[in-house]
Structure formats: structure tokens, C-alpha cells
Amino acid sequence: MNVTHLECSLTGERYEAGKIHNLSRAGKPLLVRYDLEAAAKTLTRDSLAGRQAGMWKWRELLPHDGDPVSLGEAETPIVGLPNVAARDGASSLLVKDEGRLPTGSFKARGLAMAVTMARQFGVDRIAMPTNGNAGAALAAYGARAGI
């Protein structure tokens, strides 16, 4: 793990990594900051070639250092839609097919990471205000983690 600190997305105020936080004192999300030079030492073409595909392949650029909570997240394809592009006067149109993720939504990636971090910090209950894909992803990953 190459996390150096967390940073308020509005003010830039620094927060200690490795602790549970909610929002910043300004009420804004906290961004994870990394030592990219340290990550580059182990994140090489050779090291990536031997890893299983998916988001956890990039572990040096993720804020966890234990076993991930996973439902088998795959690398999802970027698909060209030339007919739609031509119809709409665009030179090209690309879409990312996130429906192939375990819960059918891009929300799976974020919630996989959130539940992984919650488990790492010893959290045993999680709730979030949602009536959509995020709730389904949280339920699935929470169940996998035993939370």
C-alpha cells in the first residue's frame, strides 16, 4: 500500500491515513493520496503480467493492504459504437460495459473497495442512503464480508 495521506477535496487539508474518517471538517469527501514513485517500483509490466485481471491487479494504487472483499470483479471492455457515432455526427463513440461486474453496475468497484476498507478497520455494520445500484452492491459485498 502506497497511501501517504487523505486530503479534503475542497480545502486540501490533510488527514491521517489508516484511520476511519467520514467527510472532512468542511463536509467534503476525502481523496486518497499516494506515493506514486514508490508504487512505480513494484508496479511494472512484468509484475502486472503475472496477475489476475480485475481491479485488484492494481493493488499498489488502492488504499488497502489486506485480502480484498471480492465477488470476481472483471476488467470490463470498452466497446466501439460506430453506427451510433455516424448517426449522431461523431467521429467515434466508445462505451464501457460495466454491466459485466458482479452486481451489474459500476457501483460494484467502489463498494468492493469500501467494504474491503470497512473490514480492514473492523467495522461490523454498514448503512447508506440509496434505493438503487449502490444499495445492491453494498448488500452483496457486505454479505461476502460477513458485515
Positions of predicted regions on the chain:
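PLP-dependent amino-acid enzyme catalytic core
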Residues: 1-147
